[in-house]
């Protein structure tokens, strides 16, 4: 975008500080912000009908991890972007939906109202690893899974025992 539009403004956003920092690191752009910060929602004040909104001054806005965005935050975002601003929403519709109300990213993708591009290149896990392999099976509705060093099944009789075993495994790995 910077190469094509030297005078164009763009904004990088994500729902969490961790995701925005990772976005900044992976793009080499220093100014990736949380949605709350970029939208002026960090004051702790309730946002009512008469609020003074901070509009996003950008020609292009890219929001990563959009599957984590609930209905309220999505509404705040969409009412603060300009009519001619291009928006790219990045996320995984197969991840757990937002903690708050709504499965906004999934619904947008399946609405047929917005163009969708599916990226099938795996960045965070080994392409040949069992996590990616099993994720594909799970997304297809299959229960046949493969186990190995990077994908294990921990059987336990109770929730408390499950938590203890997970903690033990985590401490050994860390």
Place the predicted regions along the sequence by residue.
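Conserved RecA-like ASCE P-loop NTPase motor core of nucleic-acid helicases/translocases
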Residues: 1-27, 88-90, 151-166, 170-174
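Conserved catalytic network of the ASCE P-loop NTPase/AAA+ motor domain
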Residues: 4-5, 53-55, 79-84, 109-113, ...
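Short glycine-/polar-rich loops that comprise or flank the Walker A/P-loop
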Residues: 8, 58, 83-86, 112-117, ...
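Walker B catalytic acidic pair
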Residues: 64-66, 91
């Amino acid at each position: 975008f910077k190469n094509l539009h030297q005078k164009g403004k763009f904004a990088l956003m994500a729902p969490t500080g961790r995701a925005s920092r990772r976005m900044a690191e992976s793009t080499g752009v220093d100014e990736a912000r949380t949605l709350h910060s970029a939208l002026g929602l960090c004051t702790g004040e309730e946002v009512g009908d008469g609020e003074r909104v901070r509009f996003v001054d950008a020609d292009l806005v890219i929001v990563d991890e959009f599957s984590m965005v609930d209905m309220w935050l999505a509404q705040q975002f969409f009412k603060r972007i300009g009519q001619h601003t291009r928006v790219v929403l990045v996320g995984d519709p197969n991840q757990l939906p937002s903690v708050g109300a709504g499965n906004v990213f999934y619904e947008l993708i399946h609405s047929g109202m917005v163009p969708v591009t599916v990226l099938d290149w795996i960045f965070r896990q080994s392409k040949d690893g069992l996590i990616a392999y099993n994720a594909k099976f799970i997304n297809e509705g299959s229960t046949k899974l493969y186990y190995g060093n990077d994908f294990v099944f921990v059987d336990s009789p109770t929730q408390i025992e499950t938590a203890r075993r997970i903690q033990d495994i985590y401490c050994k790995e860390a």
